[in-house]
């Protein structure tokens, strides 16, 4: 059995335990830092954030839909996929130098989160670039293909790998004082990912009150 089949079989076995999968609220991870919700004028100002939403992955052989929770900072990424009933399907805990993936009662480790996901699942998911795209930003290796009538980026192409990733920003929404994507689609060959951000919250260090010691 190849990596993709084994990965999706593990996920669907978890889903079967909790009944039919719907896309609803997400189970969140406990905070691991002293970050607090903040308001920003632009998503580029948010060095950390957390989101709750939906993820759908499609290949010619398989389809997967799950709830997504992601807490991102410059030092750490914590990502969880769950079913509607809160059953945890997958957790990923990554730093710039290490990654730990837990799925189906098994633990996998690597020095790179993107390499780890590809090794276990067979999918080349661009986990390193997603934090930029999720917030509607264009990376240094991204090429803008089209913009909408307001001049906002509509579609970009990233050619770090071949075939390239094509990212389409389907709709936008106001969150935490900034405008971020609501739905986006990622395509690379016959692999398609769809993301929906139901809630996006910018995070930052809490302000020090007058008279308090830092």
Swiss-Prot record:
- Give the lipid-moiety residues, type N-palmitoyl cysteine: 26
For this UniProt record, give its keywords in alphabetical order, as a comma-separated list. Cell outer membrane, Chaperone, Lipoprotein, Membrane, Palmitate, Protein transport, Signal, Transport
Report the Pfam families cross-referenced here. Answer: LolB
SUPFAM superfamilies in UniProt: Prokaryotic lipoproteins and lipoprotein localization factors
Q: Which InterPro entries match?
A: LolA/LolB/LppX, OM_lipoprot_LolB
Q: How far does the signal peptide extend, from start to end residue?
A: 1-25
Q: Name one GO cellular component term.
A: cell outer membrane
Where is it mainly found? Answer: membrane
Which compartments does it reside in? Answer: Cell outer membrane
A GO BP annotation: lipoprotein localization to outer membrane
Q: What does this protein do?
A: Plays a critical role in the incorporation of lipoproteins in the outer membrane after they are released by the LolA protein.
Subunit (UniProt): Monomer.
Can you tell me which family this protein belongs to?
Belongs to the LolB family.
Could you identify this protein by its name?
Outer-membrane lipoprotein LolB
Organism (species) = Shewanella sp. (strain MR-7)
